[in-house]
Amino acid sequence: MRIAAFNVENMFQRTKVFNQSDAQLAKRISLAAGELNLLFEKPRYSPADVRRMRTLLAQLGLDRAAQNRYALFRDIRGRLFRRTDAGLEFVATGRADWIGWVELRAEPVNAVAIQNTARVIRDASPDVIAVVEVENRHTLRQFSDRVLTQVGGSPYGHVMVIEGNDERGIDVGLMTRDDYPLRLMWSHVHEKTAAGSPLFSRDAPEYEVRTPEGRRIWVIPCHFKSKFGGDDAASRAKRAAQAARVAEIYRRLRDEGNEAVAVLGDLNDTPGSEPLRALLQDTDLQDISVHPLYDRAGLPGIGTFGRGADRDKIDYILLSPALFSGVRAAGVIPRGAWPGEGPKPRWEAYPEVKRLEHAASDHFLLWADIP
């Protein structure tokens, strides 16, 4: 059985600001939109809240119009403010007075990039694959049935995505072959932190997969809190809480007698990081990238995005001892990622990856052959 994990960075629609080259602009817009939506949820808006909303709306250019190139202000019922010649006049006193939000606009992913995503999955040919940053189940189904087959791949019989708490459409999904049915699913999307906010922005569901021989393998796809907005204390604490909870889920599965468990996906931190300690150091899960049979595919380290150096390791396939001990082969596929410009590319990419926008993803696919 071959298992894989791949952060595809969306199939058909990608947040528009993330498709341009200015990382600082993307960071500012993403953070401003996120902070605004949190402020909107307050039951009462203080004068300080209103001042901050005014500043953030101006940063997004939404003080002058309801939409622009990168952001959109949706006013569904009631009204947050009026636009006047003198500026914004706030009329809502709290969340109960209106319904609305700010969302980041999306645009179609480059058609060549979509096909390169399919080529990566075709070449890996996993029986079970965790797909990170996918829009929804329908999108993943269409990708499997339409795009994967266009490049000579085989469609997947079972496709599942559980919608998470992140409004950007970057959820985690699972695809399995016809003879690897999904028997049970357990979502953790409603779990809260001590402060009452969602613990998982993207769900960390449990799937029971049955093999053709009738064995049970539990698969937990993950996408932890990103460092994109800055690796601050709040970001680290969120990843630590997510890692600790997934470690609890893993221990429960093992205590229930399940020896075959895989935790996989984009954990958004490095192997020695403190936020991932509960999962990587405090359980008996083992990282496939340290297995002696792991094939780096010519990369300088075990990294899974960027340049492929050790410091670029943020994607994982973590296996329980029973699975890790039986690994027959494992590796990484960087061929769909942009190898850089110049006469000496960082790795051998597909001939179709001629420009940055042709890249399947910034991430590489991980795979392992397990018993």
Where are these regions (language model features)?
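N-terminal, active-site-proximal structural segment of metallo-dependent hydrolase catalytic domains
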Residues: 1-150, 160-165
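Active-site metal-binding loops of divalent metal-dependent hydrolases
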Residues: 8, 134, 224, 266-267, ...
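Structured beta-strand-rich core segments of catalytic domains in phosphoester-bond hydrolases
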Residues: 65-66, 72, 76, 109, ...
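Active-site environment of divalent metal-dependent phosphoester hydrolases
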Residues: 136-138, 167-171, 227-229, 268-274, ...
